[in-house]
Regions:
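Short catalytic micro-motifs in class I SAM-dependent methyltransferases
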Residues: 58-62
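A conserved beta-strand element that flanks and buttresses the S-adenosyl-L-methionine
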Residues: 55
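A short glycine-rich, Lys/Arg-flanked "PGG" loop and its adjoining helix->strand segment in the class I
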Residues: 69-81
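Short N-terminal helix/helix-N-cap motif within the alpha/beta-hydrolase-1
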Residues: 64-68, 95
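Class I (Rossmann-like) S-adenosyl-L-methionine-dependent methyltransferase catalytic domain
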Residues: 1-45, 86-144
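An acidic, carboxylate-rich microenvironment
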Residues: 67-70, 120
Length: 144
């Protein structure tokens, strides 16, 4: 996001960590950044905006699949016409791929995280696209 900011993009953001918000604000002094838990949704100032793009990187795997659906539907409503949500995270196309990665990871697998499985979100979001960029991560996109 700092690169986008450097190119003149207006940046808005939310993180549950006050410290992360503080560090980001130091790098992007004109950005509108807020502290808040995604499980409670976006803070009011962010809900009042409309966006060309919404980016989420390695943050939404803390939500259950049901919470992801609710949260993403809320984000879709905040997009401008032809806006897009881009999510970079630990993600898989299928449950089989996730289970294979979990087996390979063994004890280092984080059981507390709820990683994205694109095929399982597709019924809620027929427009969902998934592009893998490693064996255990990818970009999910939703366009309005």
């Amino acid at each position: 996001t700092a690169r986008l900011y450097a190119q003149g993009c207006c940046m808005y953001g939310q993180d549950f960590s006050e410290r992360m918000v503080q560090l980001a604000q130091e790098k992007m002094p004109d950005a509108k950044l807020y502290s808040g838990d995604f499980k409670q949704g976006l803070v009011e100032p962010l809900r009042a905006q409309r966006y060309d793009f919404i980016l989420a990187t390695y943050s939404l795997h803390h939500l259950t699949d049901a919470e992801k659906v609710l949260f993403l539907n809320g984000l879709l409503a905040l997009l401008k016409e032809d806006g897009e949500i881009l999510i970079g995270d630990v993600a898989f196309r299928t449950r089989v791929e996730l289970e294979a990665c979990k087996t390979q990871a063994g004890a280092s697998w984080d059981e507390d995280e709820i990683y994205f499985v694109a095929d399982e979100l597709a019924p809620a979001f027929p427009q969902l696209k998934f592009v893998p960029f490693s064996a255990c991560a990818g970009i999910l996109s939703l366009r309005r």
